[in-house]
A protein has these predicted regions:
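Transmembrane beta-barrel domains of bacterial outer-membrane proteins
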Residues: 46-291
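Cleavable N-terminal export/targeting peptides
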Residues: 1-50, 291
Length: 291
């Protein structure tokens, strides 16, 4: 065999080895993030927001008619050592359905994982807590919501807390277009208290589109957008600040839950608690949801 052929084979072997090593590294990273979330589940009531519902309780009130829980993790592109993975564990529950509306609670824990000090370094922890009451008008639902967000640094000095509370009006609706399900959640609120942020008001919308291909497989696309008004006295910013996320993928149905595999893009305002600058990432990950 010629030296050129041997060199070519050696180069191919190195390339294949590097690709396999990179894949193993990403897989190990995803498993570590899941483990971090599983261990963190006792630290707080970690739950995502409420979703529109089609089935309502009978004329009499019903206690705990429904609940929803999720575990999710996704990679963050860009190579910034502060932002490598993003992961969530949480759920929501309707404590009481009184037929013409419901009382609900929500809690969510998010871990932002970087690689500054070690391969998997939890840099930020974010808690969301909500309480809401709603009323139904036909197929529409309107809710009053108290929404709390608290952001923390992990293993890092931060003398001042970062938190805000929003009193919000929210609209929820399910739509059906020839078998394609569309869930719409939109809200507008006033930031009633805040610490170390300049937010004054909030607008948000969440649109989730799903289409079932077979009993076991479906497709989905989801878009979320959020805007905050700001107080120029605090940080000198005058224009509203924006966040957004779009993801799409497949939904694999099992007897006890649903696995979503997705890819997309996210633009997050004030991603770093020191710099308060927006960051845009490509994302790829999974989500487990109970039925």
């Amino acid at each position: 065999m010629s030296d050129a052929a041997e060199s070519s084979e050696s180069s191919d072997w190195v390339t294949r080895h590097a690709v396999r090593a990179a894949c193993r590294s990403r897989l190990v990273g995803l498993l570590v993030v899941v483990a971090l979330l599983a261990g963190a589940r006792h630290a707080a009531a970690q739950q995502p927001g409420p979703v529109p519902v089609d089935s309502i309780s009978p004329d009499k009130a019903e206690f705990l008619p429904r609940s929803r829980f999720q575990l999710a993790a996704n990679s963050l592109s860009g190579g910034d050592p502060r932002f490598t993975w993003d992961a969530r564990f949480g759920g929501s529950a309707d404590v009481l359905d009184y037929h013409f509306g419901r009382l609900g609670i929500v809690g969510d824990y998010e871990a932002v994982v970087g690689s500054e000090r070690r391969n998997f370094d939890v840099e930020q922890g974010l808690y969301i807590l909500e309480a809401s009451t709603s009323g139904r008008i036909g197929a529409n639902e309107v809710a009053m919501v108290f929404h709390h967000v608290s952001r923390h640094l992990s293993d890092r000095l931060k003398p001042k807390a970062t938190a805000w509370n929003v009193f919000e009006g929210r609209y929820l609706r399910n739509l059906d277009f020839s078998g394609t399900q569309v869930a719409v959640v939109a809200g507008v609120g006033n930031v009633v208290t805040h610490v170390d942020v300049d937010y004054t008001w909030n607008l948000n919308i969440d649109i989730n589109v799903r289409h079932q291909i077979s009993p076991r497989v479906g497709l989905y696309a989801r878009g979320l957008a959020e805007a905050f008004g700001v107080d120029p006295v605090i940080r000198g910013r005058t224009d509203p600040q924006h966040s957004g996320r779009f993801e799409g993928g497949v939904r694999l149905h099992g007897r006890g839950g649903i696995l979503e595999l997705f890819a997309g893009v996210e633009h997050r305002l004030d991603a770093d608690l020191h710099d308060y600058i927006p960051v845009t990432w490509g994302i790829m990950g999974f989500r487990l949801v109970n039925k």
